[in-house]
Amino acid sequence: MKKLIDTLKNIWKIEDLRQRILITVLFVAIYRFGTKIVLPGIDYNGLDKLQDQTATGLMSLLDMFSGGAFSHASIFALGIMPYISASIVMQLLAVAVPYFQKMQREGESGRKKISAYTRYLTVAILLFQAPSYLFNLKFQVGPALASGIDWPVFMVPATIILAAGSMFILWLGERITDKGIGNGVSLIIMIGIIARLPNAFFQEAGSRFAAATGGGLVMFLIEIIILYAVVCASIVLVQGVRKIPVQYAKRVVGNKTYGGARQYIPLKLFAANVMPIIFAQALMFIPLAIVQYANPQEASWFTRSLMDHQSWLYNVIFAILIIAFTYFYTAITLNPTQMAEDMKRNNGFIPGVKPGKDTAEYIDTVMSRITLPGSLFIAFIAIMPAFAGLLDVKQEFAQFFGGTSLLILVGVVLDTLQQIESHLLMRHYDGLLSSGRIHGRGGVAAY
């Protein structure tokens, strides 16, 4: 405990880190305040039906990603997911279309162009999604519109406000990334999820304690133990690495000898972090956006199954998408050929493997071997809420038994802590984590 207190004091001593944390807290507070502002023209007291609708099914998950803004007809109701959807499309285009491939190879200028295209596409998606949300709002809470306002008159300004709200959230996320601590977009999603956790916890506790059959306390304690075990497993998954030994040749410069030491390349078991989960979840929201233009009761069995995140069809497709996006995102994040060239340029080699092409193939083989079990495990954890629901765990609490919510929480928290850790170690302070090193198969590798 004393070490933790000393570390927190050290964080406060570092002016740059202190300012980054305060800026992050400020922007997060602005985001949470915005989720409470209801669209102009909506009577808040008439939103009960919408909140009942978002209490179950896929809408409850979408409401959690928006921090409760979706069910409260907030100006931030559409959240950050339209931007995530646009990012998916642009990353696919960067792999499949030569024009965008060339742009991606242009370095910083190319990334700025792709970022601009992503924003334009986000606006286009918002111009589709905002009316979709408003049509659903009319179907659910038509009487909640303030008297004297017609829906046709309400639609245009409401669409603009919803689109502007989402773009403002994106701006907040980018400012957090640039001037704050952590990945801004992921942090905003995580804050929305955390906002739902206390209510879900107390609902489940109240349900178990009120059970007429008795044994509610025991069942609730078992649930907490299982939840703790799943959290630990998720942390191991996110932190796990496979280290490839690298030997550097000795160089004599003047009277001094350099190199000759053995180091490691730490390949993470789940190199893609939380992005495949967020991307897969964004795609699973598409049927919901489409069906909002019509009465959900008139949708086909297939569409209704995709809207129920506890159905077998939804979970099978969701798991497949996570596995596919894990491979895709790992492939665009790690470049074995570039790693092999950098190693060769610095007189490094993997023992028993020829430098150059053979080294690139070896790294690619190792990545394929560790990505498969990692993606399967992450997909299993992602669909665990469906199994929790079968055991009579309340749906809102079941979403934290693995699932997208827990994986995002674990991934974002660890990523943010590691960024704080790097600031502390750079200034020769002890870090928040137990060590400034990565542990995994093959020994210890320095950052």
Listing of model-derived features with the role each one plays in the protein:
Residues M1-Q104, S109-Y447:
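N-terminal cationic and glycine-rich segments that engage phosphates or anionic surfaces
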